[in-house]
C-alpha cells in the first residue's frame, strides 16, 4: 500500500510538472543544448514600463511562431529525483509526453481532453483541456499577459525571466520561465508548499509534420513508445 501511495504521489507530481512543461513548451526555439538555470541574484533587474512590455511582446511573438515541436526533457523533482522523456507538440491543443523507463507515465492531449496513463497503477486520469494550464497556450493565439497573471519580468545579461501564476486563482504556486537569446532554456515550478520542480530541455526541433496518432488518448492506442 505504501509503495502504491508513493507511486500515485509521483504520478500526480509528474502531471503537475508536465502541465508546467506544456505551459512553456510553445516558446521553444531550435536548440541542441540542455537548459541552463539562473539562480536568483542581486544582478537580476526587474523590468518595468516600456522595457517590460517590449520583453513580453518578444516572448509572445516567439510563442505564436510555433506550430510543431519535438524534443527531450528532464524533470527534477523537489526530492532530487529525475525523470526524462520525449515530448511532441502541435498547436492548437495537441501534446504528448512520453517518460523513459522505469517511469510508467504517458500524458496526451487530443485537443479537447488531457489524459494521463500510469501503466504501473493501471489507471488513466482525464480532465478537460480547458480546465488545465495547457489551454492557455495551445490556442490559436497566445498572450501571456492576458492568459496568466505576470508576477515579475526580470533580466540578467542575455537572460529574461518571466514569473507567472494562474490568473483564475484556482491553482496555487508560480512558474518562472527562463529565456536566452529568445529561446526558452528552462523553467521552475514552485507549488503552494514551496516545493520546486525543474524542467530542462534538449534536442528541440520544429518538424514539418507529426503523426496525428501521437495525440490519440492512451485508452485508444497502445501506451508503448511511438517512433
Predicted regions and their residues:
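An acidic-aromatic
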Residues: 86-136, 198
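Flexible, surface-exposed loop/linker segments and immediately adjacent secondary-structure boundaries
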Residues: 121-160, 164-167
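Extracytoplasmic
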Residues: 64-68, 82-84, 90-94, 101-102, ...
